[in-house]
Swiss-Prot record:
Protein name in UniProt: Phosphomethylpyrimidine synthase
Family in the record: Belongs to the ThiC family.
A Pfam family it matches: ThiC_Rad_SAM
Catalytic activity: 5-amino-1-(5-phospho-beta-D-ribosyl)imidazole + S-adenosyl-L-methionine = 4-amino-2-methyl-5-(phosphooxymethyl)pyrimidine + CO + 5'-deoxyadenosine + formate + L-methionine + 3 H(+)
Entry annotated with the keyword NAD: no
Binding-site positions, Zn(2+): 279, 343
Pathway field: Cofactor biosynthesis; thiamine diphosphate biosynthesis
Record's function text: Catalyzes the synthesis of the hydroxymethylpyrimidine phosphate (HMP-P) moiety of thiamine from aminoimidazole ribotide (AIR) in a radical S-adenosyl-L-methionine (SAM)-dependent reaction.
EC number(s) on file: 4.1.99.17
Keywords attached to this entry: 4Fe-4S, Iron, Iron-sulfur, Lyase, Metal-binding, S-adenosyl-L-methionine, Thiamine biosynthesis, Zinc
Annotated NCBIfam families: PRK09284.1, PRK13352.1, thiC
Gene3D superfamilies: 6.10.250.620, Radical SAM ThiC family, central domain
Cofactor, how bound (note): Binds 1 [4Fe-4S] cluster per subunit. The cluster is coordinated with 3 cysteines and an exchangeable S-adenosyl-L-methionine.
């Protein structure tokens, strides 16, 4: 749908949405986002120009349906997919993409580290995707040197970053905030460095005793991103991997650097969002969100979870959705889903579904809490359907209609029960929603109460 939109921009030195927004131009992508968000187009332009909102939209991803990530827009959810050396293949990843989009993923990250030709997998995902696609280029950089981290050069990183941009990737996680002087700060941690990309760069710095090449070559990356309108997703290499490590000196030192890099990218009109933790106790979530806004000048915050406890392997879509809902309420713009397989293995299709629904709940709850326009409309419609025993309408309005119908039909499968005024929980005689109080009866009762004392017993 964007082929004609981007045709006139090709060949220009800077084609970012932020660049046009700062020139006072409302692009077709901004207009599309305004309609999706039910917000004025000029507000979208202002938020993009200010850096509080991004529209990840690589000019080479022409089948993209533009969306926004920012505090003024609805809270978004990202789903991670990706093949590994031990599991999955191209078709499985495209199937996961389609499943993620079906269940409401607003963006999808391809985190493939193996399982076939990474370029073919990525290209297939981009070509099939109506939502923005993100990647972590350092993974393919490592694959290009056959896993020998010490052999990586700055040019290796830049080559892969530009390749992803050319292929149509809308945002890239760039681990430029972890500096060599930050590494001693992880000494007191239980889980050290838990970011895959951050771990790769830490090992490179420890071997070479040189500064992070993504930091020293950040200007070169900016120039690449300007030409394709790739958004930065500044990686939090030192995010806490357990609640013990949350909000420590290592995390906050990197966050300060991420703020500096954000403003450097903005000087060139390149869009930025900033990634965040991780594992954070509930009482520290508000601090983390506000600290990010302060250090990063209100660039959109994109958090993984956070998990609020570490003791529930197999249920971390729940431990993290609790933290995600709180983070969204405090102003986080996008939540990266966590599946039940987190810390245990590569998620399958059912894990993707469960993780996504948990996070759609968290994001929607945050939208309601922040009083975003129209956020509660669907809740009210479903509640009316529930009160009227309109079972099919309830299923239709559910985040996961198939699961809602499946659970209802487990005990009452016959079609006749789709019009019944009860479910199997209370049965036909005890459902409280059968108590329909007539408006006229209430009016008469009010008149009675106004003039007669209530008889006890």
């Amino acid at each position: 749908m964007r082929t004609e939109w981007v045709a006139k921009r090709r060949g220009q030195g800077n084609v970012t949405q932020m660049h046009y927004a700062r020139q006072g131009v409302i692009t077709e992508e901004m207009q599309y986002v305004a309609r999706r968000e039910n917000l004025p187009a000029d507000l979208i332009r202002e938020e993009v120009a200010r850096g509080r909102m991004i529209i990840p939209a690589n000019i080479n991803h022409t089948n993209l349906e533009p969306m926004a990530i920012g505090i003024a827009s609805k809270c978004k959810v990202n789903a991670n997919i990706g093949a590994s050396p031990n599991s999955s293949n191209l078709q499985e990843e495209v199937d996961k993409l389609n499943l993620a989009v079906k269940y409401g993923a607003d963006t999808v990250m391809d985190l493939s580290t193996g399982g076939g030709n990474l370029d073919e997998i990525r290209t297939a995902i981009i070509n099939a995707s109506p939502v923005p696609i993100g990647t972590v280029p350092v993974y393919q950089a490592l694959e290009s040197v056959h896993g020998t981290i010490e052999n990586l050069t700055p040019d290796d990183f830049l080559h892969i970053i530009e390749k992803h941009a050319q292929q149509g990737v809308d945002y890239q996680t760039i681990h430029a905030g972890i500096l060599i002087e930050h590494l001693p700060l992880v000494r007191s941690r239980i889980t050290g460095i838990v970011s895959r990309g951050g771990g790769i760069l830490a090992r490179w710095m420890l071997h070479h005793h040189k500064q992070n090449p993504l930091y020293t070559h950040f200007g070169d990356i900016i120039e690449i991103f300007k030409r394709y309108d790739v958004s930065f997703s500044l990686g939090d290499s030192l995010r806490p991997g357990c609640t013990h490590d949350a909000s420590d000196d290592a995390q906050l030192a990197e966050l300060k650097t991420l703020g500096q890099l954000t403003r450097k990218a903005w000087e060139h009109d390149v869009q930025v969002m900033v990634e965040g933790p991780g594992h954070v106790p509930m009482d520290q979530i508000e601090f983390n969100v506000k600290k990010q806004m302060e250090e990063c000048s209100e660039a959109p915050f994109y958090v993984l979870g956070p998990l609020v406890t570490d003791i529930a392997p197999g249920y971390d879509h729940i431990t993290s959705a609790i933290g995600a809902a709180m983070a969204g309420w405090y102003g986080t713009a996008m939540l990266c889903y966590v599946t039940p397989k987190e810390h245990l293995g590569l998620p399958n299709a059912e894990d993707v579904r469960n993780g996504l629904i948990a996070y759609k709940i968290a994001a929607h709850a945050a939208d309601i809490a922040r009083h975003r326009p129209g956020a509660r409309d669907r809740d009210d419609e479903l509640s009316k359907a529930r009160y009227n025993f309109d079972w099919n309408r309830q299923f239709e309005l559910s985040l996961d209609p198939e699961r809602a119908k499946e659970y209802h039909d487990e005990t009452l499968p016959a079609d006749i029960y789709k019009t019944a005024e009860f479910c199997s929980m209370c049965g036909p005689k005890f459902c409280p929603m059968q108590t329909k109080v007539d408006a006229d009866a209430l009016t008469e009762l009010e008149k009675f109460l106004a003039k007669e004392p209530v008889t006890q017993g």
